[in-house]
Amino acid sequence: MGQYYRPVVETTKGGMVSINTYLDGEYERAKLMEQSWYTHPFVNAVVSRLYNKPSKIAWVGDYATSVVDDFPNTPVQELYNTAYGEGSISLDTLKSNDFTLDNKFLVNHDTKEFIDLNKYREENTVGGYCTHPVSLLTALGNGCGSGDFMYHAESEEQVANVGKWAWNTLEITDTAPREYKEVMYLFREN
């Protein structure tokens, strides 16, 4: 059966809120690989919230509770409850915008690392398609349902990196932070 994902972001008061999988009032497909394309309007609308505004973020699958032990420093159960539990709070429908990752950097303030997104796109484009680093690096539950990245990856190393930045403080910036280490992740489909 397919696993569906919802992004969960940190509120300004340190709480958590889920983002509905709707864009401009229309339902957006919610399997991980459906939300893992570089130019996907829904994903970029979510990610635009990180532009010059650091925030914790995770892409939470509806089977994520089966991976709690794989993420000992991540509040997987609380993130799951925020996304899918009774009384979960969700943001209103997102509006599309023209935000892109061109000439930007994805910064992880917890690990003191960053990704040059122009280089990322160059390294990860295969057949004209490129995966989106944010949904894959923050995914919780990969491998628990069809439509997950593990069924599409070129290598086990790529699969192991899915979720590596889940619930870390991320930011999209126009400049690379000087004291941080530049890293590269490959998420290419076979």
Residue ranges of each PLM-predicted region?
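Short, extreme N-terminal segment that most often corresponds to the first beta-strand
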Residues: 1-25
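Low-complexity intrinsically disordered segments
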Residues: 32-190
